[in-house]
Amino acid sequence: MDPHGTCGGSNVPAFLAKLWTLVEDPDTDPLICWSPEGNSFHVFDQGQFAKEVLPKYFKHNNMASFVRQLNMYGFRKVVHIEQGGLVKPERDDTEFQHPYFIRGQEQLLENIKRKVNTMSATKSDEVKVRQDSVGKLISDVQSMKGKQESIDGRLLSMKHENEALWREVASLRQKHTQQQKVVNKLIQFLVSLVQSNRILGVKRKIPLMLNDSSTGHSPPKYSRQYSLEHVPSSTSYPVSGFTDSSAGPIISDVTELPESSPSPSPCPSLEASPSPVILIKTEPLTPSQSPEQSPAPPKLDDTPISPSTFIDSILLETETSVCPGGNKNDEMSESHPPEPCLSVACLDNISLSRQMSEVSRLFPTSCSSVPGRAEPPGLDMAVAELNDHVDNIDFNLDTLQNLLNGQSFSVDTSALMDLFSPSLGIPDLSLPDPDSSLASVSSTPIYTCVV
């Protein structure tokens, strides 16, 4: 028997033909033979089989290669129960089986095919798919990397812009604080400038009607008529609500005056036109007395020149010039001692001609009921000094008004420009103290009106 012979079919692989011959050879039955059923074959003593039989039919004597080829053609190793135990079998027996490898049916060998390496193909396909996926993934990663770099650049730029904005905000806050301080100092400067030139209690010039002076004063901006009188104890004024004659002089607002008539009427001007009465609380200054001034009546000895004494002297002079003495007045002067003048003196703030007409209308010649007094010796000099003082105050007020209206303040503009400079340092201004500007007028007497 030719050990290298092949089976009749040409489609049978050489390994299967050699295997069929090897199993059919009775000389090799001690090492390889069919099973009793004829559907498998047994290999005994693999070491001796590899040394003595394999070199005769194959080009190698490696049992592992022989088993690998069997597995390649679909042969499976049959495992018996006794072989799976812990006790090693006495005989080395390995059984291989294939559905088309049956004793006496050599024609079935054509159906035995070598296994196609589907796993390798599948693996190659999978590898190719994986490579495509990896390539796509790599491209996506690169795209994401580029986007990430762009985002990182934008974030870095935004970070720098944010830092710049914070620095600008800090600078703007400092500038805002600086401007607030500058504005506050400017306001303090303007307020102190205005307060230093302010005169308390002087709102308008008040002309005095003393004697028959030929020099008139300009009418005030807001003219209003007032009447000054002493309130007798026996007379009650329901308008004012004060009946005490010792309350001092009362300034009443003359809102209505009777119209002038050709013939003088007997002095009903006070009763015909009731006027609101204003109580004056005076805190007079102590003027210097003239050595030529004669002593006053006993009632006014304690006060050198009080407001009531000064007004009584003015009223006395007015009554003396308007109402000359008569027989009736002489009789009254003989029977009664001198009393304070109780007539109404019109201290109006209009022109002298209008004042004289009002006085003539209020004090006609036929209505004098009180005798005249002797004029104090130093009255003319006091009146002249008072007129000069009033004119001086009027001139100062006009000058101040022109100064304020003309806006002719001399302000150093360089200091202001330095204040608004972008530098952070704030120059110190030596501004006048607002409280010290009022120190000069703190000693001025204040007349408080209690209505």
Curated annotation (Swiss-Prot):
TM segment ranges: none
GO molecular function, one term: sequence-specific DNA binding
One cellular-component annotation, GO: nucleus
Presence of keyword Transcription: yes
Region annotated Disordered, chain positions: 210-273, 285-307
UniProt cross-references to InterPro entries, sorted A to Z: HSF_DNA-bd, Vert_HSTF_C, WH-like_DNA-bd_sf, WH_DNA-bd_sf
Post-translational modification (record): Exhibits temperature-dependent phosphorylation.
Polar residues biased stretches: 232-246
UniProt entry keywords in alphabetical sequence: Activator, DNA-binding, Nucleus, Phosphoprotein, Stress response, Transcription, Transcription regulation
Source domain of life: Eukaryota
DNA-binding region(s), chain positions: 12-117
Localization, UniProt: Nucleus
Cysteine disulfide partners in this protein: none
Family the UniProt entry places it in: Belongs to the HSF family.
Binding partners and assembly: Homotrimer.
Record's function text: DNA-binding protein that specifically binds heat shock promoter elements (HSE) and activates transcription.
Protein name, per record: Heat shock factor protein
Organism, scientific name: Xenopus laevis
